[in-house]
C-alpha cells in the first residue's frame, strides 16, 4: 500500500513537472533572451570593426580602447539602478527601456562621423545592456519552475554566445556601419514581442495585482493548469519579504550575508580577470598579433560557441553548477597558458608553425571552457544565493561590479598586449588557477535545492 502511494506521488510529480514546460514559458523566455542576443552583439562588435573604424575615422589605439570600454561604463551606471528600476516599473517595462537605449546606441554608431558620436552610441548601448544583464536572469528565474531553472537561466548565456558568434562571422562580410544596423534588429524584435508575454508573477504580487498574477501564471503554466497553489505560495513569499524590511547597501555587508556576497562578487571578478571580455572584444586583433588570419580564426570561434552552449543548457540541471565551473576554470587555465606560450615562442622566432597551431587550439579551448561554466553560471548562481530582503541591492551591486571589472580588462587589454602578449595570457592563466581554488573552497552546489535551502545554508556558514 505504501509503495502504491509512493508510486502515485512520483507519477503526479512527473506529470506536474512535464506540464510546467509549456509554450507560454518557452515563448516568454525566447522573447526576453533577445536582449541577451543584443548583449552578445554589443560585446563582440568591436572585434571585427576595429581595423576599419580606426582607419576611416582616424582613431588611435587609445581612442579605440576607450570606444570599446565606454560601453562598460554605461553598463556600470545603469547596473547601480537596475534593481530599483525593475522593481518600480516592472520587468517588461525595464526591458523596453533597455531596447530604446540599445536601438539609439546602434543607430548612433552606424551613422557616426566622429569619435564623439561613436562614443555616445557605445555609451547608450552600455545603458541598455546594463539593464539587460540584470533583468533578463531575474525575469527567467521568476517565471521558471525549479525543475528547469538552471537550463532556462542558461539560455541567457546561449543567446549571448549566439550574438558573439554572429558578430565574429558576419563581421568578415559586412561594413561596420551595416553591422551596427543589423545589431539593432534583436532590440526592435523584442520591443514588439514584449506585448505578447506576461509580466513576472512575483512582481505583480509585490503590487497586490492578484487577478493579473493569476492571468500571468495561466499564460506561463497553461490554461488548464491549477495555478492556485503556486499563486498562494508567491503571495506568501512576497508577504514575508514585506515583513522583512528591504535592506540597503549597509545591511548587505551584515555577517549573515557575508558568504553570499563573497561568492557573488568573487565569481564576477574572476570571470572578468580571466580575460574573457578581452577575447570577445579583441579576437581579431589577437589572431593578427599572432600572425594567424583573423577572418579564419573568428569564424572558427563563431562555429564552436553555439553547440557547447546548447550542451550546457541541456545538462546544467543534471550535472550541477560546481562540476561545470571547475571544468571550465581548469580548461581556461590550461588554454591561457598555451596561448601565452605560443606568443612567447613566436617572439623568440621558434617553432613558427607550431605557434599558430597552439594559438588556435588555445583560443578554441579557452572559449569552449569559458562557455561551459564561467560564461553563464555566475549569473545563475547570483540569482539563487541572496535572500529576498537584500536581493535588489545585492543584484545591483554584483551586476555593477561585473561591469566595473569588465571595463578594467577591456580598457587595459590593448596596453597589456603592447607590453607583453605572452605575459598577458600567463597572468590570465594564473587568475584561472585562483578561480579553481575559489570555487573548490567557497562555491556551494545549488542544483536541485530550493532557494530557501540554498540561502539558509549560506547564512549558517557566514
Curated annotation (Swiss-Prot):
Q: Does the keyword Transmembrane helix apply?
A: yes
Family matches, as Gene3D superfamilies: MFS general substrate transporter like domains
Gene Ontology cellular component list: membrane
Keyword terms: Membrane, Sugar transport, Transmembrane, Transmembrane helix, Transport
What CDD domains does the annotation carry?
Answer: MFS_GLUT6_8_Class3_like (cd17358)
Which PROSITE patterns does the annotation name? MFS, SUGAR_TRANSPORT_1, SUGAR_TRANSPORT_2
Q: How does it sit in the membrane?
A: Multi-pass membrane protein
Localization recorded for this chain is: Membrane
Q: Which GO terms describe its molecular function?
A: sugar transmembrane transporter activity
Protein origin, superkingdom: Eukaryota
Where in the chain are disulfide-linked cysteines found? Answer: none
Where does the sequence pass through the membrane? 23-43, 70-90, 96-116, 123-143, 156-176, 178-198, 261-281, 296-316, 324-344, 357-377, 397-417, 423-443
Q: What is its main location?
A: membrane
Question: Family, per the entry?
Answer: Belongs to the major facilitator superfamily. Sugar transporter (TC 2.A.1.1) family.
Q: What role does it play?
A: Sugar transporter.
The name this protein goes by in its record: Sugar transporter ERD6-like 2
Annotated organism of origin: Arabidopsis thaliana
The gene behind this protein is: SUGTL3
Amino acid at each position: 500500500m505504501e509503495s502504491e502511494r509512493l508510486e502515485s506521488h512520483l507519477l503526479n510529480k512527473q506529470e506536474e513537472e512535464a506540464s510546467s514546460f509549456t509554450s507560454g514559458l518557452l515563448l516568454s523566455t525566447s522573447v526576453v533572451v533577445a536582449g541577451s542576443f543584443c548583449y552578445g552583439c554589443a560585446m563582440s562588435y568591436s572585434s571585427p570593426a576595429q581595423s576599419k573604424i580606426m582607419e576611416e575615422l582616424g582613431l588611435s589605439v587609445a581612442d579605440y580602447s576607450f570606444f570599446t570600454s565606454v560601453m562598460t561604463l554605461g553598463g556600470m551606471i545603469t547596473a547601480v539602478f537596475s534593481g530599483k528600476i525593475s522593481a518600480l516599473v516592472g520587468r517588461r517595462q525595464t526591458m523596453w527601456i533597455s531596447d530604446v537605449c540599445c536601438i539609439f546606441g546602434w543607430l548612433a554608431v552606424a551613422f557616426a562621423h566622429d569619435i564623439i558620436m561613436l562614443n555616445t552610441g557605445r555609451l547608450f548601448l552600455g545603458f541598455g545592456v546594463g539593464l539587460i544583464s540584470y533583468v533578463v536572469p531575474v525575469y527567467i528565474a521568476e517565471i521558471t519552475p525549479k525543475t528547469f531553472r538552471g537550463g532556462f537561466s542558461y539560455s541567457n548565456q546561449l543567446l549571448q554566445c549566439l550574438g558573439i558568434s554572429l558578430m565574429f562571422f558576419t563581421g568578415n562580410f559586412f561594413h561596420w556601419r551595416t553591422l551596427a544596423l543589423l545589431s539593432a534588429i534583436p532590440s526592435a524584435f523584442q520591443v514588439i514581442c514584449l506585448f505578447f508575454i506576461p509580466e513576472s508573477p512575483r512582481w505583480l504580487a509585490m503590487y497586490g495585482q492578484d487577478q493579473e498574477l493569476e492571468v500571468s501564471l495561466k499564460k506561463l503554466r497553461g490554461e488548464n493548469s491549477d495555478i492556485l497553489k503556486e499563486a498562494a505560495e508567491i503571495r506568501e513569499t512576497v508577504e514575508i519579504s514585506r515583513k522583512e524590511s528591504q535592506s540597503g547597501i549597509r545591511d548587505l555587508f551584515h555577517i549573515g550575508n557575508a558568504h553570499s556576497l563573497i561568492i557573488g562578487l568573487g565569481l564576477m571578478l574572476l570571470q572578468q580577470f580571466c580575460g574573457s571580455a578581452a577575447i570577445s572584444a579583441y579576437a581579431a586583433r589577437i589572431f593578427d598579433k599572432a600572425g594567424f588570419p583573423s577572418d579564419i580564426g573568428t569564424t572558427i570561434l563563431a562555429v564552436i560557441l553555439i553547440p557547447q552552449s546548447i550542451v550546457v543548457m541541456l545538462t546544467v540541471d543534471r550535472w550541477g553548477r560546481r562540476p561545470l565551473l571547475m571544468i571550465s576554470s581548469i580548461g581556461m587555465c590550461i588554454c591561457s597558458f598555451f596561448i601565452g606560450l605560443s606568443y612567447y615562442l613566436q617572439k623568440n622566432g621558434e617553432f613558427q608553425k607550431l605557434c599558430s597551431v597552439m594559438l588556435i587550439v588555445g583560443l578554441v579551448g579557452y572559449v569552449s571552457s569559458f562557455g561551459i561554466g564561467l560564461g553563464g553560471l555566475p549569473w545563475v548562481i547570483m540569482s539563487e544565493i541572496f535572500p529576498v530582503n537584500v536581493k535588489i541591492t545585492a543584484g545591483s551591486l554584483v551586476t555593477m561590479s561585473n561591469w566595473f571589472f569588465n571595463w578594467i580588462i577591456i580598457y587595459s587589454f590593448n596596453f597589456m598586449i603592447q607590453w607583453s602578449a605572452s605575459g598577458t595570457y600567463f597572468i590570465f592563466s594564473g587568475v584561472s588557477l585562483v578561480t579553481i581554488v575559489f570555487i573548490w573552497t567557497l562555491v556551494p552546489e545549488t542544483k536541485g535545492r530550493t532557494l530557501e535551502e540554498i540561502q539558509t545554508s549560506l547564512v549558517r556558514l557566514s
